[in-house]
Amino acid sequence: MPPKKAAPSKADLAKKQKVVEDKTFGLKNKNKSKNVQKYVQSLHQAVQPKPDPTKTAAKKKKEEEKAREKELNDLFKVAVSQPKVPVGVDPKSIVCEFFKVGQCQKGFKCKFSHDLNVQRKGEKIDIYTDKRDAETMEDWDQETLEKVVASKGAEYQQNKPTDIVCKYFLDAVEKKQYGWFWVCPNGGKDCHYRHALPPGYVLKSQMKALLEEESEKIAIEDEIEDQRKKVKTTTPMTTDLFMEWKRKKAEEREAGLAALRAERAKNDRMSGRELFMADSSVFVDDAEAYDVYERQEESEANEEPSNKNQDEGPSSSTSNGKEVEESDDEDINIDDDLDIDELNELEASLSRTSIQIREPGEGTSS
């Protein structure tokens, strides 16, 4: 096949257009004479590129199809009508009727849904509740209320409330025929039997599946044996092996605790219990710890009144005598509490110390 000719560029078209203008320049009656107009048109046609016949045919065919679709739309538009949207219902839950036949021109601006599966995505029917239970006096008008009051006596005798489940309802559920548009053969909504499964009710189809599942289950003993057979290295379990394993586990546990205690002791983070368990001798009090503390406390208590007596002077001699007697009694009581070693130490200290008693008048006379 010969190569296709390249499309003329704009520069070439401009040159040819200029040639046409040069040839038609100065012609008289260019706009009036038919012969001159034919000549000018022939020049223009010679300059302009010839259109592709295939593209022209495709464009013509496309225009014919659009005209045909427009004609069909005009014919079918009369028969298609959008449904009325009830109060409180989302329009997007209703499929657009024009979209079903491919005639909706609004696109995403259409208030109706363009999803054909929107009806399947709705709420599933509940087979464990009776739809008639939701009908209350709040939904009745005056006429309905009067009819109910007029026929209540006879209706109660005919349709007594019962908890028996309708056999037609059970049959429809078992055969998977129950749905939003199912009507009870026993009078429809007037059927006085329950159209709801009792709590915990298991259908026969479900029961069959459960029985098959239970039959396929393996007993625990058999499963243990199967798992035991899968183990390649088997060692018979005996009492000695078990005790050895238990001892190793205890040693590992003790080693772990010892390492943890050592780490905590290294970081000075041991608790009192851990310190006591590590070395209980640290927490033993000295034999004289309590007695020394008691003696110091009593000596401090005796020093305070003596200081007060020195500040008061000789006028309080009688009171001083009483305090001295009381202090002597306390010393006697303290001595009663001392043991033999402490008494020996006290006697030795007193023998090394020379006690000088000076009367108040002796200092002045000398």
UniProtKB/Swiss-Prot annotation:
At the top level, the lineage of the source is Eukaryota
Keyword hit for Membrane: no
In what ranges is there compositional bias, type Polar residues?
Answer: 312-321
Question: From its record, what is one biological process in GO terms?
Answer: cytoplasmic translation
- Among the Pfam families in the record, one is DFRP_C
Residue ranges the record marks as coiled coil: 54-79, 208-234
Positions of C3H1-type zinc fingers: 90-117, 160-198
What is the name listed in the Swiss-Prot or TrEMBL entry for this protein? Answer: Zinc finger CCCH domain-containing protein 11
Name the keywords, alphabetized: Coiled coil, DNA-binding, Metal-binding, Repeat, Zinc, Zinc-finger
Q: Which GO terms describe its cellular component?
A: cytosol
The molecular function terms of the Gene Ontology recorded here are: DNA binding; zinc ion binding
Database matches in SMART domains: ZnF_C3H1
* InterPro entries reported in the protein's UniProt record: ZC3H15/TMA46_C, Znf_CCCH, Znf_CCCH_sf
Q: Name the residue ranges with Acidic residues bias.
A: 325-338
Question: Upper taxonomic classification of the species?
Answer: Eukaryota, Viridiplantae, Streptophyta, Embryophyta, Tracheophyta
Annotated region Disordered: the residues are: 43-66, 293-338
